[in-house]
Amino acid sequence: MPQLPMTDSAPLPTPAPSSPAQPSAQPSLHYHLLGIGGIGMSAFARLLATRGHRVSGCDQNLGAQTAGLEAQGIPVAAGHAAAHVTEEPFGKIDVLVASEAVPKSHPELAAARAAGVEVRPRMALLGELLAAGPSVGVIGTHGKTTTTSMIAVAMYGAGLDPSAFVGGNVPEFGGNARTGTGPFVAEVDESDRGFALLGCETAVFTNAEDDHVGGELATYWSTVEEQHAGFARFVAQSGRVLFCADWPGLDTLCSGAREQLTYGQSAGADYRAVNVRPDESGTTFDVEFRGERLGEARVSLPGTHNVLNGLAALAVTHLYGGDFDRAARALADFHGPGRRWEIKGERGGALVVDDYAHNATKVASAVQAARQTGRRVRVVFQPHRYLRTQQSWPRLADALMDADEVLVLDIAAASETPIEGVHATLITDRMTQGGHPNVHYCPDRAAVVRDLRESAQPGDIIVTMGAGDVYRIAEEVVGGSA
């Protein structure tokens, strides 16, 4: 087997398949999580509970995540109140965990400080989990959730028994978190500036663009340069980095890493996907490590971006000593985390899919994945956030041009205040001016559902895209009566 590359310092030892995460030195504590129904906080809740801690939480909006937590014995209160910290039903709290985006005036934060309860930022908690033992942190503007899921699934298939912290629900794990005895695999979200204070054993760097920049959110970045410096800092504070050789500029951002490895289709990548064979439901390819063939792999999700995500997963599993063939079989059986190319069903012979794509690169990748199926591509796109739309509407419009039909909904505000002049019609007008023959602004969601139910036919693929609640349209199209 080719040797791992040497750097000025000795490379990290490859952990044995059974290497356990180091147990926390802390005694059992009572953690109270603000916004426990969120995808990240609910994952923290599950991880902390399986590590023997007492966990409680609250959220303004109760739903499937909070119901799942309560079914696991984790109490959840509706809304936010100082009494959640100082009185029953939760009892004495040792640590309150909150996002840095939560205002200091929040009643539970204020009550915790007054009572002498430790307030711990969520990124600090993630940092502790990453530092506790062998760890893999996935960073980048796009593909983090899918790549993190694929790494954890491939490692699990290879017998490495990973723990996982994922920004999406992984069917193989029954949720967004898993506790095992092997390496801890975590999605590290750059939307929280605190990520730049962290590091891990192996950083996986997918790509870098502009997102979560500007605006009023406390955790967002002032400039894209500042954000990319945060990526570079995370990499430099990690033991080694595996970065995508196909993405321009990552080599520069990774120049401070102690040990560098690359993956991609580019010539010279350490881990390389070759002989790539796409079909309507996914892609088969061969994996090489420094010119030596490791074996054949398949991702059961269409799109070139998913080849790269899957390649990263197999590379990490190989780095940690996992069996390639077992990892490849597990990866081939994986059909994605929730809201990432999630097949909702059929209507009138049309395939109905939902995808979280919400910025231009993700949208373009999702459209390309839809085209790979060979079907007529019908997209329902919901722009996400006024600021993001203001910053990128021309690119969003251009990313949608390859779809056969595009229906654009109103912008999902995501708690933002509307910005004057920023409207979904910026996207549709640009597409029309660019020559797209079948793009429509559709403020009436019920009419969209009705039209799709009536017009869906064999040979179509209907893809709902966006980070808001556009997935509900896919569910209504599939589940509604004829």
UniProtKB/Swiss-Prot annotation:
One of its GO terms (molecular function) is UDP-N-acetylmuramate-L-alanine ligase activity. Residues 1-26 are annotated as: Disordered. Pfam families: Mur_ligase, Mur_ligase_C, Mur_ligase_M. Keywords: ATP-binding, Cell cycle, Cell division, Cell shape, Cell wall biogenesis/degradation, Cytoplasm, Ligase, Nucleotide-binding, Peptidoglycan synthesis. It comes from the Bacteria. Pathway: Cell wall biogenesis; peptidoglycan biosynthesis. GO terms for biological process: cell division; cell wall organization; peptidoglycan biosynthetic process; regulation of cell shape. GO terms for cellular component: cytoplasm. InterPro entries: Mur-like_cat_sf (IPR036565), Mur_ligase_C (IPR004101), Mur_ligase_C_dom_sf (IPR036615), Mur_ligase_cen (IPR013221), Mur_ligase_N (IPR000713), MurCDEF_pg_biosynth (IPR050061), UDP-N-AcMur_Ala_ligase_MurC (IPR005758). It is found in: Cytoplasm. The keyword Mitochondrion does not apply. Its EC number is 6.3.2.8. ATP binds at residues 140-146. Its main location: cytoplasm. It catalyses: UDP-N-acetyl-alpha-D-muramate + L-alanine + ATP = UDP-N-acetyl-alpha-D-muramoyl-L-alanine + ADP + phosphate + H(+). PANTHER family: UDP-N-ACETYLMURAMATE--L-ALANINE LIGASE, UDP-N-ACETYLMURAMATE--L-ALANINE LIGASE-RELATED. Cell wall formation. Belongs to the MurCDEF family. This is UDP-N-acetylmuramate--L-alanine ligase. It comes from Deinococcus radiodurans (strain ATCC 13939 / DSM 20539 / JCM 16871 / CCUG 27074 / LMG 4051 / NBRC 15346 / NCIMB 9279 / VKM B-1422 / R1). The gene is murC.
